[in-house]
Curated annotation (Swiss-Prot):
Region (Disordered), start-end ranges: 65-91
CDD domains, A to Z: Peptidase_C19R
A Gene Ontology molecular function term of the record: cysteine-type deubiquitinase activity
Gene (UniProt): UBP10
Residue ranges annotated for the USP domain, each copy included: 304-895
Protein name stated in the entry: Ubiquitin carboxyl-terminal hydrolase 10
Lineage start: Eukaryota, Viridiplantae, Streptophyta, Embryophyta, Tracheophyta
Organism: Arabidopsis thaliana (Mouse-ear cress)
UniProt keyword terms in alphabetical order: Hydrolase, Protease, Thiol protease, Ubl conjugation pathway
Any Gene Ontology biological process: protein deubiquitination
A Pfam match: UCH
Role of this protein: Recognizes and hydrolyzes the peptide bond at the C-terminal Gly of ubiquitin. Involved in the processing of poly-ubiquitin precursors as well as that of ubiquitinated proteins.
EC numbers on record: 3.4.19.12
Known catalytic reactions: Thiol-dependent hydrolysis of ester, thioester, amide, peptide and isopeptide bonds formed by the C-terminal Gly of ubiquitin (a 76-residue protein attached to proteins as an intracellular targeting signal)
Length: 923
C-alpha cells in the first residue's frame, strides 16, 4: 500500500518552516499534558506504530542531548508516519483495522488528537487510526481508550449473508439497530435483531433500548441475527431459538438446585439428610475415593468447559479453580439469597455474587459441553473496568478481585461497628491475635472469610532504636516468591592494582532487586577486602571502560547477565585528597595486509587497568611504574630477561581509532625512539574516543583530569614476557545457558518459596515504616509468620518479575506436593488443628510475559480423578502430569483429623436438628 500524504495534512498543509527537534519535543509534551488535564468521554486519540514513534523519540531526544553535551546526533529525522506494521494487510486504507493482540507500549502508542495533528503537519503519512476515550466503572470511574471496538458478525436472516459490524462497546442497542438497518436497507420498524451467540437465538434485542452492547452481554466476534417482518423464508424459520436465556443477567439468585443423590430437599434448597455434603471432607484415612455421587445416578457435573470470549482464558482458568473448590460450590448450589448484601458500599449490590452463583449452577448441571460466561464477564467489566475489553490479563489478579468482590457482596455485616483497637502492651501474642481476628470478623462475615482467609503475624524492628511492632493481619492467599527471583549470581573479575595477585573471578549471590552497595559488600567479603581498601566497579566493552558504578544506591537491575564487569581493588586515598582516575588501555600491533598504504594498525585487546592517582602532575616514568605494578603477576616464569627498548618493529605515532572496530591507525612515518628508551613500555596519551594519540617520554608531564587515559603498545617482546591471556578471558556476569540447565536439574520446592516469603528482610526505600519511638520513617526489618491457616489455602507463585529495566517470566519448575502438604512447622499458633493439605486445583500459565495461555487442572473429588480445563475443551489427565513448570496458582484444602471431622459432624447434626424442629413447628 502507498502511504497517503496530502489527504491527512492539516488544512494549511505541511509547514514550510519545520520546527527544530527540541521544539517538536516541547510542543508534543505540552499538548499531551493539556489533554491529560482535560479528560472527557468521547475525546479522540490516534494509534501510532511504536516503531515509527520510537524513531521520532530518538530523533528529538538525541538532538536534545546534542545541545547539552555538544556531541553530534546519530538519529536521523524520521520519514512519514507509517502505521502499516500494525494494521491488517488487507485493510481498506479509508477504514484501517488493527491487527489483533497488539500490546500498548510494545506495538503501538496512543496520542491525543492535537498531538496527531501536529505530527501529521510535520511528517505527513498515516493512515489515521482514530479511537475514542470512554469512561468505565461503577463505583470508581476510570478513563481508557477503546483500542479495539466491538466486532459483531451480522447474519441476514433473508439470505444468510454475513457482514462485519464494528461499534464501540458503550454504543446502545438503539444505535445497533440504526447501523444494521442502514447497512441492510431494512426499515427499523420491521427489523428484529437477535443475540445469536453460538448460532442460537439467545434473546431478542429491544430496538428502543439505550442499554449498551456490553451491558447486553454482546462480546467480541460473536454473531447477531437480523430478521424482517413479513418474510417467512426457510432460512429465518430454520433459525434455532433458546428463548431469552442470556438476554438478561438475573438480579436474584436462582432457588433451583442441582439434584443431590438421595433424599428429598427442603424448600430453601437444603437436603433433609443430616450428613449432607456435596464434597465430603477428606480425613487422613479417607482420600475421597468412596464419596457420594454429586448428581443422580449416571450423571456427572463439574465437567463443563468455559467458552473463550476473546482472550478470556485467564478468567476461565481462575473460574474453573473456584468452581471446583468444595465449600464454595456447596454454598452457591444452595440458597444463599439471605446472605446477599445489597447495601454494602464496598460491594457490587450483590450482582457479582449472583452472576457467579448462576454460572456455577450451569457448570454443575449435567449434559453441558461448554458454558459461555458472557453474563458473568459483563458484570465483571462493570465493577472492574480493568477486565473489560479483550486484552490478556492475569488469572491471579482476577482471582484476587473476585474473592474480594464475592466477600463484600455476601458480607452478613450490614453495618460495620466501630471498634477501637487496643495497644498490644506486651500482652501474649495469642491474646492479641484472637482479639484482632474477632475485630476482623465483627466487620467481615462471609463464606469467603470462613473458608479462604487466614492470619499472619507481622514483626517490624527499628534498625535505630530497636523498637518492635507486632501486628496480626488477615490474608486471602499467599503470594510467594521463587527463590531464584529473589537473588542472582554475579561473576565479577577483581584486578589487584598493587600487583599482588593475578586477576581473579569471584561469583557472589546478591539480592536481585539489590543495589551496587550490596554487590560491593558481597564482593568485598569474597575477596577478603581490607579495611583500608576499596573496590571500583566498571563495565568493560570493546576493551575499553564503558561505564563506572559509583553510586551505592543504584539498582543492580541495570547490569545485564551478558555484560563483563570488573572490580579494581584499590588502596583508599585519604579523605580530603583530590584524586583522578588513570585508565590504561592495551594495544597489539598487526601488519596491514590488504592496504599497504595504511601502514600498521594497533588493535585494542584485553581489559583496561584503572587506578586512582593524585591530581599532581605525572611523568612518563610515574605511569610506567603503575603499568609495571599491574603487570607484575602476569610475568612468565621462564620469560626472557630482555628489557624493552622501543626498537621492535612497528611504532605508534599520532593516530586515530576506528570507532566501529576499535583499531588504532598510524601513518608509516618512523618515530625517533631514542627519547623513550628509559621506559619499560611504549606509552601513548589518548582520550575517551581513542583520538589524539601522543607518545609519552620519561620526562613527559601530565596534569591528570577527572579521567586520564593512556595506551600501552604490546609488541612481541611484551607477549614473551607477560601472559596476556589473563587480560582477555573475562567471564560474563551470568551464564544463562548453564543457569537454565542447573535450574531444571535442581528445581525449587514449594517449601523453599514459603520460607523465602517468611524470611526477615529490610523494607524497601519506598516502603519506609514510621517508628513511634524515633518519630522518623525507618527502613525497618520485617518478618512474617503464619498464625492461622484457612480451610482453603491458595499459593500464588510469583513467576512474573518487573523492574525499571526488565520484565520477565520465571519458568523454573516448582516441586509442590499433591498429597500431604504439611505446614505445621511454619505455623506459630498451634491450636490442635490439622495443618495437612491436599491439592485440588491448579491455574497454569504457558508462554511468555504479556501473552501466553491459561488453563486449569482440577480434581473432581466425587470420582477422585483429575481433569484438564482448556477453555471449552475438557479432558482427563493423570495426576503425575499436573506438576510442571506452568503451575501458577495452587489450590489446597485442609485434610481434617478424625477428631475435627467428628466435631464438624456433630455441629452439622445440631444445625439440621434445629432446622427440622423449626419446620415441624411451622407445619
Amino acid at each position: 500500500m502507498t502511504i497517503p500524504n496530502s489527504d491527512f495534512m492539516l488544512e494549511n498543509g505541511v509547514c514550510d518552516l519545520p520546527f527544530t527537534p527540541e521544539e517538536e519535543k516541547r510542543i508534543v509534551s505540552e499538548l499531551t499534558s493539556e489533554s491529560e488535564d482535560n479528560l472527557k468521554q468521547g475525546n479522540l486519540y490516534f494509534v501510532i506504530s511504536k516503531r515509527w514513534y520510537t524513531s521520532w523519540q530518538e530523533y528529538v531526544e538525541n538532538s536534545a542531548n546534542e545541545c547539552s553535551t555538544g556531541e553530534s546526533s546519530e538519529a536521523p529525522r524520521p520519514g512519514p508516519i507509517d502505521n502499516h506494521d500494525i494494521i491488517e494487510s488487507d485493510s481498506d486504507i479509508n477504514d484501517p483495522q488493527l491487527r489483533r493482540l497488539l500490546v500498548e507500549g510494545e506495538d503501538y502508542v496512543l496520542v491525543p488528537k492535537q498531538v496527531w495533528k501536529r505530527l501529521v503537519e510535520w511528517y505527513s503519512g498515516g493512515p489515521p487510526i482514530e479511537r475514542k476515550l470512554i469512561c468505565q466503572g461503577f463505583y470508581t470511574r476510570s478513563y481508557s481508550v477503546e483500542v479495539y471496538p466491538l466486532c459483531l458478525m451480522l447474519t441476514d436472516g433473508r439470505d444468510e449473508s454475513r457482514t462485519v459490524i464494528r461499534l464501540g462497546k458503550q454504543a446502545s442497542i438503539r444505535e445497533l439497530y440504526e447501523k444494521v438497518c442502514a447497512m441492510t436497507g431494512v426499515p427499523q420498524e420491521k427489523a428484529h435483531i437477535w443475540d445469536y451467540f453460538d448460532k442460537r437465538k439467545n434473546g431478542l434485542l429491544d430496538p428502543l433500548s439505550y442499554k449498551s452492547l456490553e451491558e447486553s452481554s454482546l462480546h467480541m466476534d460473536q454473531d447477531i441475527l437480523v430478521e424482517v417482518d413479513g418474510l417467512s423464508s426457510s432460512s429465518q424459520s430454520a433459525m434455532s431459538s433458546t428463548g431469552n436465556e442470556l438476554a438478561l443477567v438475573p438480579l436474584e439468585p436462582s432457588r433451583s438446585i442441582v439434584t443431590i443423590a438421595g433424599g428429598p430437599t427442603l424448600s430453601n434448597g437444603h437436603s433433609t439428610t443430616s450428613n449432607f455434603s456435596l464434597f465430603p471432607r477428606i480425613t487422613s484415612e479417607d482420600d475421597g475415593r468412596d464419596s457420594l455421587s454429586i448428581l443422580g445416578k449416571g450423571e456427572k457435573g463439574g465437567l463443563a468447559g468455559l467458552s473463550n470470549l476473546g482472550n478470556t482464558c485467564f478468567m476461565n482458568s481462575a473460574l474453573q479453580c473456584l468452581a471446583h473448590t468444595p465449600p464454595i460450590v456447596e454454598y452457591f448450589l444452595q440458597d444463599y439469597s439471605d446472605d446477599i448484601n445489597r447495601d454494602n458500599p464496598l460491594g457490587m449490590c450483590g450482582e457479582l455474587a449472583i452472576a457467579f452463583g448462576d454460572l456455577l449452577k450451569k457448570l454443575w448441571s449435567s449434559g453441558r459441553n461448554a458454558v459461555a460466561p458472557r453474563a458473568f464477564k459483563t458484570k465483571l467489566a462493570r465493577f472492574a473496568p480493568q477486565f473489560s475489553g479483550y486484552n490478556q490479563h492475569d488469572s491471579q489478579e482476577l482471582l484476587a478481585f473476585l474473592l474480594d468482590g464475592l466477600h463484600e457482596d455476601l458480607n452478613k455485616v450490614k453495618r460495620k461497628p466501630y471498634i477501637e483497637l487496643k495497644d498490644s502492651d506486651s500482652r501474649p501474642d495469642d491474646e492479641v491475635a484472637e482479639e484482632l481476628w474477632n475485630y476482623h470478623k465483627a466487620r467481615n462475615d462471609s463464606v469467603i472469610v470462613d473458608v479462604c482467609q487466614g492470619q499472619y503475624k507481622s514483626t517490624l524492628v527499628c534498625p535505630v532504636c530497636g523498637k518492635i511492632s507486632i501486628t496480626f493481619d488477615p490474608f486471602m492467599y499467599l503470594s510467594v516468591p521463587l527463590p531464584s527471583t529473589l537473588t542472582r549470581s554475579m561473576t565479577i573479575t577483581v584486578f589487584y592494582c598493587d600487583g599482588s595477585r593475578l586477576p581473579m573471578p569471584y561469583t557472589v549471590i546478591v539480592p536481585k532487586q539489590g543495589s551496587i552497595r550490596d554487590l560491593i559488600t558481597a564482593l568485598g567479603t569474597a575477596c577478603c577486602l581490607a579495611e583500608d581498601e576499596s573496590l571500583l566497579l566498571a563495565e568493560v566493552y570493546d576493551h575499553k571502560i564503558f561505564r563506572y558504578f559509583e553510586i551505592p544506591l543504584d539498582s543492580l537491575s541495570a547490569i545485564k547477565d551478558d555484560e563483563h564487569i570488573v572490580a579494581y581493588r584499590l588502596n583508599q586515598i585519604p579523605k580530603g585528597s583530590r584524586k583522578a582516575k588513570l585508565e590504561i588501555l592495551h594495544g597489539g600491533q598487526e601488519r596491514a595486509v590488504l592496504d599497504s598504504v595504511r601502514g600498521s594498525d594497533v588493535k585494542l585487546f584485553g581489559t583496561p587497568f584503572v587506578t586512582y592517582v593524585n591530581t599532581e602532575p605525572l611523568s612518563g616514568t610515574d605511569i610506567d611504574a603503575v603499568i609495571s605494578g599491574f603487570l607484575s603477576p602476569l610475568h612468565k616464569v621462564h620469560a626472557p630477561s630482555k628489557i624493552h627498548n622501543g626498537s621492535d618493529n612497528g611504532h605508534l605515532a599520532d593516530a586515530t581509532v576506528d570507532q566501529a572496530s576499535g583499531i588504532l591507525s598510524s601513518p608509516d612515518t618512523e618515530i625517533d625512539n631514542a627519547s623513550d628508551r628509559e621506559l619499560s613500555f611504549r606509552i601513548f596519551l589518548t582520550d575517551e574516543r581513542g583520538l589524539n594519540i601522543k607518545p609519552l617520554q620519561s620526562e613527559s608531564s601530565i596534569s591528570p583530569g577527572t579521567v586520564t587515559r593512556v595506551l600501552v603498545e604490546w609488541n612481541e617482546g611484551e607477549h614473551e614476557r607477560y601472559d596476556s591471556s589473563y587480560l582477555s578471558d573475562l567471564p560474563e556476569v551470568h551464564k544463562t545457558s548453564f543457569s537454565a540447565k542447573k535450574t531444571r536439574q535442581e528445581s525449587i520446592s514449594l517449601f523453599s518459596c514459603l520460607e523465602a516469603f517468611l524470611a526477615e528482610e529490610p523494607l524497601g526505600p519506598d516502603d519506609m515504616w514510621f517508628c513511634p519511638s524515633c518519630k522518623e520513617h525507618r527502613q525497618a526489618n520485617k518478618k512474617l509468620d503464619l498464625w492461622k491457616l484457612p480451610d482453603i489455602l491458595v499459593f500464588h507463585l510469583k513467576r512474573f518479575t518487573y523492574s525499571r529495566y526488565l520484565k520477565n517470566k520465571i519458568d523454573t519448575f516448582v516441586n509442590f506436593p499433591v498429597h500431604d502438604l504439611d505446614l505445621s512447622k511454619y505455623v506459630k499458633n498451634k491450636n490442635g488443628q490439622s495443618y495437612l493439605y491436599e491439592l485440588y486445583a491448579v491455574s497454569n500459565h504457558y508462554g511468555g510475559l504479556g501473552g501466553g495461555h491459561y488453563t486449569a487442572y482440577a480434581k473432581l473429588i466425587d470420582d477422585n480423578k483429575w481433569y484438564h480445563f482448556d477453555d471449552s475443551h475438557v479432558s482427563s489427565v493423570n495426576e503425575s502430569e499436573i506438576r510442571n513448570s506452568a503451575a501458577y496458582v495452587l489450590f489446597y484444602r485442609r485434610v481434617r483429623s478424625e477428631t475435627e471431622t467428628q466435631t464438624a459432624e456433630m455441629s452439622t447434626d445440631m444445625d439440621y436438628s434445629c432446622l427440622n424442629s423449626h419446620n415441624d413447628k411451622a407445619s
